[in-house]
Swiss-Prot record:
<dbReference type="GO" id="GO:0005840">
    <property type="term" value="C:ribosome"/>
</dbReference>
<keyword id="KW-0689">Ribosomal protein</keyword>
<dbReference type="Pfam" id="PF00673">
    <property type="entry name" value="Ribosomal_L5_C"/>
</dbReference>
<dbReference type="GO" id="GO:0019843">
    <property type="term" value="F:rRNA binding"/>
</dbReference>
<dbReference type="GO" id="GO:1990904">
    <property type="term" value="C:ribonucleoprotein complex"/>
</dbReference>
<dbReference type="GO" id="GO:0006412">
    <property type="term" value="P:translation"/>
</dbReference>
<protein>
    <recommendedName>
        <fullName>Large ribosomal subunit protein uL5</fullName>
    </recommendedName>
</protein>
<comment type="subunit">
    <text>Part of the 50S ribosomal subunit; part of the 5S rRNA/L5/L18/L25 subcomplex. Contacts the 5S rRNA and the P site tRNA. Forms a bridge to the 30S subunit in the 70S ribosome.</text>
</comment>
<dbReference type="InterPro" id="IPR022803">
    <property type="entry name" value="Ribosomal_uL5_dom_sf"/>
</dbReference>
<keyword id="KW-0687">Ribonucleoprotein</keyword>
<dbReference type="GO" id="GO:0003735">
    <property type="term" value="F:structural constituent of ribosome"/>
</dbReference>
<keyword id="KW-0699">rRNA-binding</keyword>
<dbReference type="InterPro" id="IPR002132">
    <property type="entry name" value="Ribosomal_uL5"/>
</dbReference>
<dbReference type="InterPro" id="IPR020930">
    <property type="entry name" value="Ribosomal_uL5_bac-type"/>
</dbReference>
<dbReference type="InterPro" id="IPR020929">
    <property type="entry name" value="Ribosomal_uL5_CS"/>
</dbReference>
<keyword id="KW-0694">RNA-binding</keyword>
<dbReference type="Pfam" id="PF00281">
    <property type="entry name" value="Ribosomal_L5"/>
</dbReference>
Amino acid sequence: MAKLHDYYKDEVVQKLMSQFGYHSVMQVPRVEKITLNMGVGEAIADKKLLDNAAADLAAISGQKPLITKARKSVAGFKIRQGYPIGCKVTLRGERMWEFFERLISIAVPRIRDFRGLSAKSFDGRGNYSMGVREQIIFPEIDYDKVDRVRGLDITITTTAKSDDEGRALLAAFNFPFRK
């Protein structure tokens, strides 16, 4: 079991219960899932780029990514409905906790010119979204084998009812918010 999950059960739950005055353990917000998304617009011209992006995402997450397809045709972007244009992974359970631990302790500190993550990137319902400009911050990616530096979106979905609850939950995990 991931250390962060044990830490959540042992310490974070008690801390949040006293902070927000919850009566039941089930009221305490928890991390539900983490979604990783990589949009590969250049895949229209070269299908191999999408395969490389999917391989990178699989290495980062430890799970086979789902290839996302265009929902509708857009002439300006030269895409048709059904074209593969990206890939995504939804992590839950044990894999989610392991990824969350690696994200906080290893990957985020390796971001160039890192001064903390914005605390304003919540969606109003306690879910946090962030963008990573380079996939090479993850130790699973071999720098020498990277064909192109790509970014990815990371969304942390919580059961929090408000942004304040979500912020308190992530702050309890020592999430590196900008001061």
